[in-house]
Amino acid sequence: HTYAPSIETVPFQGSDPLAVSKEIRQYLTVHPDTYAIYTCSARFTYHISQCIRQLGIQDRIQVIGNDLFTESRQALSDGILRGVIDKKISKQSALAVKTLFDYLLKKDYPRSSCLVMEPEIVLRSNFQSHSDLQK
């Protein structure tokens, strides 16, 4: 940690969000001075948000989640999440399907072998105006 030597990273690994959430809940109980959590997937964002809500510690911990979906929007609104890294999964999927459709049916070859979809950082302060939230 060259940039922040006083920060200790504690990775939690596993593919079962419920099991990892339980492990994090236990960790937070033993280490109440934990300052922040970053979750790298939408599934884990949901479960960690639920854990923080149930523990009632949203005022003392900074949680950054991944992807905008109904529950992460609610967690932002409720102050459970401080921010979300929106990878625009639905737009990525739509672009992939459109590109494949155009290629297979229209013989329209993609202009590039790499299609870039820039992620966005959505914070509590700007999520109400975020374009993906407009219904």
Predicted features along the sequence, with ranges:
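Short helix-loop-beta junction
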Residues: 1-4
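Conserved beta-strand scaffold positions in the cores of enzyme catalytic domains, especially
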Residues: 7-11, 63, 84, 121
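Hydrophobic alpha-helical
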Residues: 12-71
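Residue-level recognition of short, well-ordered coil/turn positions
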Residues: 32, 57, 80, 107-108
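Short, well-ordered alpha-helices that flank and scaffold nucleotide-derived cofactor binding pockets
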Residues: 50-54, 78, 98, 102
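Flexible loop/hinge segments that line or gate small-molecule binding clefts
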Residues: 69-77, 81
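Short beta-strand elements at the ligand-binding edges of bilobed clamshell
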Residues: 78-90
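Hinge/cleft segment of the Venus flytrap/periplasmic-binding protein
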Residues: 88-135
